[in-house]
UniProtKB/Swiss-Prot annotation:
InterPro entries: Kinase-like_dom_sf (IPR011009), Prot_kinase_dom (IPR000719), Protein_kinase_ATP_BS (IPR017441), Ser/Thr_kinase_AS (IPR008271)
Annotated gene: RTK1
UniProt EC number: 2.7.11.1
UniProt protein name: Probable serine/threonine-protein kinase RTK1
Organism encoding this protein: Saccharomyces cerevisiae (strain ATCC 204508 / S288c)
Induction record: By the alkylating agent methyl methanesulfonate (MMS).
Positions of modified residues (Phosphothreonine): T58
Reactions catalysed: L-seryl-[protein] + ATP = O-phospho-L-seryl-[protein] + ADP + H(+); L-threonyl-[protein] + ATP = O-phospho-L-threonyl-[protein] + ADP + H(+)
Biological classification of the source: Eukaryota, Fungi, Dikarya, Ascomycota, Saccharomycotina
Amino acid sequence: MVKETPLHSSSSTSLSSLFRPTKLKNLSAKIFNGGGNQSYSKTDDVSRSSSRSSKKNTDSDQEDQIKYNKPNDRRSTIGKSPQGNGALSKESHVVASSTLTGISPTSAKKAPIDYSPSRPLPNNHNPVRTGHTVPHLPHSIHNPINYIHQGSKDAFHHPHPVRSTAHSNISTVSSAKSDTPSSNLSYQAHMHPVEILQKQIEDKHFMDSQASTPGSVELQHNSSSGSDDTSSRKKKSLRLTRFFKKIHNDYHDNHHHHHHHNRGSTPTKPKLNLNTNENIVESNGKALYETDNPVELLEKYGIPGRKLGEGASGSVSVVERTDGKLFACKMFRKPHLNNEGTNQSQLANYSKKVTTEFCIGSTLHHENIVETLDMLTEGDTYLLVMEYAPYDFFNLVMSNLMTQDEVNCYFKQLCHGVNYLHSMGLAHRDLKLDNCVVTKDGILKLIDFGSAVVFQYPYEDTIVKSHGIVGSDPYLAPELLKQTSYDPRVADVWSIAIIFYCMVLKRFPWKAPKKSFNSFRLFTEEPEDEDDIVRGPNKILRLLPRHSRTIIGRMLALEPKQRVLMNDVVKDDWLVSVPSCEVDPTSGDLVEKPKNHKHHLVTEEELNELTKQHGNKDSN
């Protein structure tokens, strides 16, 4: 296990203090103030992909015990629906530099976009539907990298003529050369934008810490070896099951799903204790957190509302600002410390995981991916603030109200969201029903990037393999259980096909992709002839709509090298012909509402009522 310099945060601070010597307010890490004279620069190298530094899983006799990197964590990153329908501010976003001072979203202006890419990645000519653009990051003496995303064109731009000579899996900050880690360093010329922001945060943590030990401090990048062990799930059937702890008494118990709020009363200011693992819940259902200084969170985002759900790494609540706008706020759970000797290492890994998730989320801007807006810190506790969408996709599937046209619309949106993600050199690795939410306009959004990894770097053709079993059993690609390394792109493709199967049939095809399960074993066997529906792919495909079978069959190819990639999935003739809902990337308004379907949006309480009514009919 590599080491990381421990964090020594003040008791009440916001992550923007990473870039500001004065009292911390918050990190609006992505807002660029084009009207000011502020100098912006990316700072240092970052950790390479987790798939390069992760410990390989060599325990072949433990194949049947499936490990999770984030077990049961459906809502551990973003609103365990209901999420919210507050429109995002449409200011441009960039990654903050170490010289960034406080910039509010309301005062931000759009920055110019560089349209002169020298060489795109091979997979950047995909038909990507974008919701936002990431403006040009100005050059500086510390910033040889220029990152842009411009629609379906070039996700990465690298004008610097010098290729990086250091191609390490783990970033190294030398404290022997200088008192500060960023004063005399060579910067990687081929880093992913996610890693650039990650390194800025790490450098500030390094400087804020009082550690003066000479030598190098090595940082592990997003371990994917499944350290959060959970025993294999044993289900009685293939019925769809959540993989997180759902808070059944959700936000809608006290709020109408059209969000008509009572403005007449002033809510009591809650006490926030962000350094405790347990939340205090009063009789009114509000989830309260105690802290000595809750003003920052309350002033910017409002009072935390009812807890929506929780997973292995934290819990998510909805917050309502004074103007009525809603946000999803995730509080990451501080790890239990075993002993004094391991405290620093555990805290370092914890902060690394949280900031990595923030860095990935804040890099992505697309209509089918939830927006990551801000990160706040209180001591050793982190709060991640995200766009809020009101409807839980798992609930929508389980409502049994979806028409096939509605299913196809959601599937197309999901494919475009993942295609965009892959075009940015990132793989999700935990795609499932639980990690999708839906807006009031029927726009599906991907959430939870805690397991995401970089598989391709700017200006490079190499695909970086991933390691470790990450995800939930039924959605896993079979190679994860057999190989020590795998291509995370095609693992995502497999998971999307399983999601489509679940949407259509309301059940899983198998408990896990292992031949010890009869359903999967029959799927892998050679059919006796082309009409054999017991063995081979037809066992699954015959149950799906006819026009979808060709592309789903290619997505479920057992051999990873034969599996179709997302840029080809979105070009499939059937998928292209599917009418789907789209929003305007500037205004956020719905620009296309297909006439062949409408979206049946139900809340948790409405689903419970439908289930109760269905149960009464069955009993009669």
